[in-house]
């Protein structure tokens, strides 16, 4: 089985695929509550608990873990250097937890490489997260999204979609 993770400090998307590439689990783990998760370490502890549930309770025999590679370059108008550093730090903590839980180091896939492996093309000026979500809604009957009263995807929808694409790209690389 394959685990794909979209790691961020607010919501972590997680998707588990069978060896045939079928989705058996696709969730978003919400870490935004500052009372429950005041530091990166409480957030990491929650992710660890969820990974242990996949491993010990759901009994998914995860043999490969793929994690979306964190951004490595500062670009004006996007995330600040501090935000990128925090994300990279959290990504490292989660990577270590995955290695300890599944006894194998995770593999990293960039978002653009994952989209390309899944046949998703993002036109200039379009938001990649929206393109990915719409691609899945149009092409996979098993993927669904709940919407807010204003018609926007509920929090976690984009994270689930991204983890799905990371898992599928990992599956594709293993089967090519």
Where are the language model's segments positioned?
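Phosphate- and other anionic-substrate recognition elements at nucleic-acid/protein interfaces
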Residues: 1-176
């Amino acid at each position: 089985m394959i685990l794909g993770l979209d790691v961020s400090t607010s919501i972590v998307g997680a998707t588990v695929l069978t060896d045939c590439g079928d989705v058996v689990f696709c969730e978003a783990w919400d870490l935004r509550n500052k009372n429950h998760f005041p530091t990166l370490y409480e957030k990491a502890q929650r992710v660890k608990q969820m990974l242990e549930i996949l491993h010990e309770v759901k009994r998914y025999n995860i043999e490969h873990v793929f994690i979306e590679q964190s951004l490595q370059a500062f670009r004006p108008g996007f995330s600040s250097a501090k935000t990128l550093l925090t994300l990279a730090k959290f990504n490292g903590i989660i990577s270590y937890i995955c290695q300890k839980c599944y006894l194998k180091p995770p593999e990293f896939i960039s978002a653009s490489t994952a989209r390309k492996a899944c046949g998703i093309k993002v036109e200039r000026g379009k938001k990649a997260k929206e393109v990915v979500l719409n691609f899945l809604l149009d092409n996979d009957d098993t993927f669904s999204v709940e919407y807010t009263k204003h018609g926007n995807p509920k929090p976690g929808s984009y994270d689930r979609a991204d983890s799905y694409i990371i898992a599928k790209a990992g599956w594709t690389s293993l089967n090519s």
